Each structure stands twice: as structure tokens, then as C-alpha cells.
Regions:
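Short acidic active-site motifs
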Residues: 9, 68, 132
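The Walker A/P-loop phosphate-binding site
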Residues: 1-55, 71
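Catalytic-core regions built around general acid/base machinery
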Residues: 97-107, 139
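Short, well-ordered secondary-structure micro-motifs
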Residues: 55-56, 91, 121-125
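Phosphate-binding/switch region of NTP-binding enzymes
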Residues: 108-159
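Conserved Walker B
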Residues: 49, 83-85, 116
Length: 159
């Protein structure tokens, strides 16, 4: 689906859920999340790669530790984590903490931005998979893959 339709679809599905947006580098993941953020009033970007420099009407926390933002969650509508693989700690424990936040803060929705990485599992036929795929395919509510086709961003719903 095209970007505009993808934004509408993802916004409808966010409703107190955890959504993953994954894709290759430069495939529009951060761009898509910023378009989604513009539809929300209180947004916190957790910039774990410490690269966000542009001005924004939203809040930005440059850290790779989820615990650093926990105290402000009751005031936030949307938490965008860019990039999930850069968070400190075990991915399974991180996703459990995010699920706990979703349970405790009923107006909170979470978007995880994730990179596709080389898959070194010899038993798998896929050469590349999203980071912590084994955890995220079970514990995210919806998953979207971004790509670039003919110079345009394309978003595909996986789950």
C-alpha cells in the first residue's frame, strides 16, 4: 500500500497496541513513523541511535534504555522507538516491559522501528530477518514491512 493509506491503516490499528515497522536501511521506516506522529498530540520519540537532529513539535529522548522514559508515559499518546535493536538489554525483556506499559497506560500506543539483519540461522531459508524476529512476531500486535519500489515507499502488512 502507498504511504498515505499505510498511515491511516496503522493509526487505526495503534489503539493501545505495539506495532513494528521494519525494513532495510533507507526504506522509509522513520519517515512513515513521523507521518503517523503528526496525527497525535503527545508523542515521544525514543531515539536510541542518537541521530535525530531536525526540529519537531514532538518530544525526543536520546537514550537506549527504556527505563529512562518510563516516568513520562502517563502523559504520552504515542511512543516511537527508533531503533529497537539499539536498545540496551535483552530484546525479550524489552518487549515484556513494553507489553507491561501497554497494560498499565491505556491511552499509550507504541511503534517499534526495526532493521532487517542478516540471518545466520543455517536451518532457515530466509537470508535476512528483522532483529529479534523470534520475539517480535509473537509479541507485537501488528507488523508492517517497508520497501522502496520504483522510487516510492511501499508498506506491506505482515501481521
Amino acid at each position: 500500500m502507498k504511504t498515505g493509506r499505510a498511515v491511516t491503516t496503522i493509526c487505526r490499528q495503534l489503539n493501545n497496541n505495539v506495532i513494528e515497522i521494519f525494513g532495510n536501511s533507507e526504506s522509509g521506516k522513520s519517515y512513515l513513523s513521523k507521518l503517523i506522529a503528526d496525527r497525535y498530540e503527545y508523542v515521544l520519540f525514543l531515539d536510541s541511535v542518537m541521530k535525530m537532529t531536525e526540529e519537531s513539535k514532538h518530544y525526543i529522548a536520546q537514550t537506549n534504555n527504556l527505563k529512562d522514559v518510563e516516568e513520562v508515559l502517563s502523559d504520552i499518546d504515542l511512543l516511537i522507538i527508533d531503533d529497537f535493536c539499539q536498545l540496551s538489554g535483552d530484546p525479550k525483556k524489552n518487549i515484556y516491559l513494553l507489553q507491561e506499559w501497554i497494560y498499565n497506560y491505556k491511552k499509550l500506543s507504541i511503534i517499534l522501528i526495526n532493521q532487517i539483519r542478516a540471518n545466520f540461522n543455517k536451518q532457515s531459508v530466509e537470508a535476512y530477518k528483522p532483529y529479534a524476529n523470534y520475539v517480535l512476531e509473537r509479541y507485537t500486535d501488528h507488523r508492517f514491512m517497508t520497501s522502496v519500489e520504483n522510487g516510492e515507499y511501499v508498506v506491506t502488512q505482515i501481521k
